[in-house]
């Protein structure tokens, strides 16, 4: 019984930390293209959406944060900055007195030259 408990703990710890390690490698499965001083995903887009919000400004801010949080979680901090994203499209819709906004963009990160050894 004691061994099973230790195995269960080991499995739980592995599951907790495995996504964090692999999250930074997820970007390698997508084709990338250089756009100015940035490296961008060629065709892979991320979405951020707000729930119904009292103000348009609040809904836009929420959708932008949602995009940045998910992209940062999946690819790391370098890829999760909306101001660097390419092909950005935002749309807000008013339903009654409330607003809902969504944003779609391709993640980019600053271009870094690889050092020659």
Regions found by a protein language model. Name each.
Residues 10-16:
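Bacterial N-terminal signal peptides
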Residues 21-117:
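Domain-level marker for long, solvent-exposed, non-transmembrane regions
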Residues 1-9:
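Bacterial N-terminal signal peptides that target proteins for export
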């Amino acid at each position: 019984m004691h061994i099973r408990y230790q195995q269960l703990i080991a499995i739980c710890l592995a599951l907790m930390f495995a996504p964090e390690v692999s999250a930074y490698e997820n970007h390698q499965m997508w084709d990338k293209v250089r756009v100015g001083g940035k490296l961008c995903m060629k065709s892979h887009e991320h979405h951020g959406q707000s729930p119904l919000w009292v103000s348009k400004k609040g809904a836009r801010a929420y959708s932008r944060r949602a995009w940045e949080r998910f992209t940062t979680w999946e690819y790391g901090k370098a890829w999760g900055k909306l101001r660097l994203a390419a092909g950005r499209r935002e749309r807000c819709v008013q339903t009654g007195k409330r607003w809902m906004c969504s944003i779609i963009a391709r993640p980019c990160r600053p271009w870094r030259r690889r050092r020659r050894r």
